[in-house]
Amino acid sequence: MTNNQKVKTLTYSAFMTAFIIILGFLPGIPIGFIPVPIILQNMGIMMAGGLLGPKYGTISVGAFLALALIGLPVLTGGNGGAASFLGPSGGYRIAWLFTPFLIGFFLKKLKITTSQNWFGELIIVLLFGVIFVDFVGAIWLSFQSNIPLLTSLISNLVFIPGDCIKAILTVVIVRRLRKQGGFELYFRK
């Protein structure tokens, strides 16, 4: 990687971290029957893997989560600190760390970023940005809130329609940005 590419990578990674933080300024929508709101930050998490690939997408999200963990109010609703990782939403946040890696890895492995296969990219984003995150989040919610696992899984179905819309928007935006150039570096072998 040349010095110019290193600077570009650092800039893109910092921008992605900032973008995820900005999405947290938009208030969450409380659902009522479970203590986890509908938020937009997960869209930024999905975008990190699709734009920056497995390595730099994970670094970007890891930086965001580290800022949240040390107490900066970067999570939706101005939350931060270790308690926000131990509460009802903790499982989703833990899954977020793995999401850009999984999305980026499979996009790279299947060479979907260089093809016109937007549907294949959508399937990968749905699998790892929606189903994986909601599944891990539901398991955590079950244990943390003492809710039966089946009840927790069923209650998470409320997130699926909105998360699917966010996944579609993510694929459309990411493919458009990738078409502009500069991101192909992150999907080379």
UniProtKB/Swiss-Prot annotation:
Assembly notes: In E.coli forms a stable energy-coupling factor (ECF) transporter complex composed of 2 membrane-embedded substrate-binding protein (S component), 2 ATP-binding proteins (A and A' components) and 2 transmembrane proteins (T component), probably with a stoichiometry of 2:1:1:2. May be able to interact with more than 1 S component at a time.
Protein keywords: Cell membrane, Membrane, Transmembrane, Transmembrane helix, Transport
Native source species: Lactococcus lactis subsp. cremoris (strain MG1363)
PANTHER family, per database record: BIOTIN TRANSPORTER BIOY, BIOTIN TRANSPORTER BIOY-RELATED
Superkingdom of the source species: Bacteria
Function recorded in the entry: Probably a biotin-binding protein that interacts with the energy-coupling factor (ECF) ABC-transporter complex. Unlike classic ABC transporters this ECF transporter provides the energy necessary to transport a number of different substrates. The substrates themselves are bound by transmembrane, not extracytoplasmic soluble proteins.
Any Pfam family the entry gives: BioY
Family: Belongs to the BioY family.
Transmembrane residue ranges: 19-39, 57-77, 85-105, 123-143, 154-174
Signal peptide: none
UniProt GO MF annotations: biotin transmembrane transporter activity
Annotated coiled-coil segments of the chain: none
Protein known as: Biotin transporter BioY
Compartments it resides in: Cell membrane
Major localisation: membrane
Cellular compartments per GO CC: plasma membrane
Membrane topology summary: Multi-pass membrane protein
